[in-house]
Amino acid sequence: MRTFKNYITEQKASDVLKNWRHDDAKEYAERLIKTFREPDEVTETTLSWNSIEPPFDRVWVIDESIPHDFPAAHRDYVYSSMKIQVPTELLDILGHASGSIIYDGLKMEVTARCGTLYANAATLGFVKDLVDGKIKPNKEQ
């Protein structure tokens, strides 16, 4: 008897990456595969890892290359998420801090989008410090 699983073809990261249009995102995804192993999820345009050790809950690379000029010119394609509950009064501050901070209030999850995991860690660290009161914003910020 054939089961549903017999009809499913699992995509491999290497097969999907052959068709990616953005070389910078593709090269970074390949580097993450070497460092963290094959992704947990593979689609035509996204590779994601749900099991990279903290600080991230989830990391994913999308076949995109978004120009971003803060703090210096670079391109964004890697996303990292953490569970951080952001008080409502801080949301406007986060929105103005960087276009690369995304907050999902229903999941209480903050996502950083940048060009490296290091930059995402720094961004999420900033959010955590702001929420924990270690950073006090002023009107000039």
Model feature map: region roles:
Residues 14, 21, 25-141:
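A cross-family detector of function-defining hotspots
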